[in-house]
A protein has these predicted regions:
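Catalytic Tyr-X3-Lys loop
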Residues: 75, 93-113, 127, 131, ...
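Conserved NAD(P)H cofactor-binding loop of Rossmann-fold oxidoreductase domains
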Residues: 78-88, 242-243
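Catalytic loop of short-chain dehydrogenase/reductase
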Residues: 83-84, 97, 131-178, 191
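Short alpha-helical oligomerization interface
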Residues: 87-104, 149-154, 202-204
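Short, small/polar-rich loop/turn modules that mediate ligand/substrate recognition or access, typified
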Residues: 177, 182, 233-235
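C-terminal substrate-recognition "lid" of short-chain dehydrogenase/reductases
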Residues: 214-240, 245
Length: 246
């Protein structure tokens, strides 16, 4: 892959951190946008960190303007940011409208606004690559039996948000066809993250081989979409789930 300048939102999260590490290792310039503590240190000249509230369009515009001015171009943006309310994950019966509206705005609304603004920069450059992060829960109904015996659940708003991101991807790819842009999304299955043993066991029964994924499994697919090998792929949802969604 040619050396690129890449923005990673949510770059200190589970998938975002693994992606940022991978990109830095390959020699790319990586601009991590996150409100969390820097987990990558300050010893890499190719790493740049920015704190920004991605729910506010004025901050998004400032961020993208800053990157465009400082680096002269931005080759790609990978949107891994995943802000949640404190009561995220409650069962449907306990879901409150205020929380629902906030999560839809924070995750789905901000995805549209971020996409709109980075694409404006891409159009000025006459090239760009946008990768959004969805989920297999945006493709199919949850397999509720997987959660039996645990306190976990799959929130209805999560399915709505992630299916919306797949639709946004396809819409944008079609809307900006013939503009020399690549716009795709990635839908991972469950990621290993100190989850209950019962859930891990139930989940693996639904898969072909591995079960829960490592962040690296998702990063490999994102790296492919960032590379020249995917030059003629756009508007697609790439699924990485070890067969869970079958």
């Amino acid at each position: 892959m040619n050396k690129k300048i890449i923005i990673v939102t949510g770059g200190f999260g589970t998938i975002g951190l693994a992606l940022s590490k991978s990109l830095l290792k390959q020699g790319h310039k990586v601009i991590v946008v996150d409100t969390r503590i820097n987990k990558l240190g300050n010893n890499n000249a190719n790493l740049f960190t920015i704190k920004a509230n991605l729910n506010k369009e004025n901050e998004i515009k400032k961020l993208i303007t800053l990157c465009g001015t400082k680096f002269k171009k931005v080759d790609a943006l990978v949107h891994c940011s995943y802000p949640k309310t404190k009561d995220w994950g409650v069962k449907l019966e306990k879901l409150k409208q205020k929380s629902l509206n906030e999560n839809l705005n924070n995750q789905l609304g901000s995805t549209i606004i971020i996409s709109k603004n980075i694409i404006n920069l891409f159009l000025k450059q006459n090239h760009g690559n946008l990768i959004l992060l969805s989920s297999i829960m945006g493709m199919n109904n949850p397999k509720f039996e997987t959660y039996k015996g645990t306190k976990m659940s799959s929130p209805i708003e999560y399915s709505a948000i992630k299916s919306g991101i797949i639709s946004i991807t396809k819409y944008l790819a079609k809307y900006y066809a013939k503009k020399n842009l690549k716009i795709n999304c990635v839908s991972p299955g469950g990621i290993e993250d100190n989850l209950p043993k019962r859930f891990v066991k139930n989940y693996k029964k639904q898969c072909n081989f591995k079960g829960l994924l490592d962040p690296k499994d998702v990063v490999d697919a994102i790296n492919f979409l960032l590379s020249e090998k995917s030059n003629f792929i756009s508007g697609q949802n790439i699924v990485i789930d070890d067969g869970y969604s079958l």
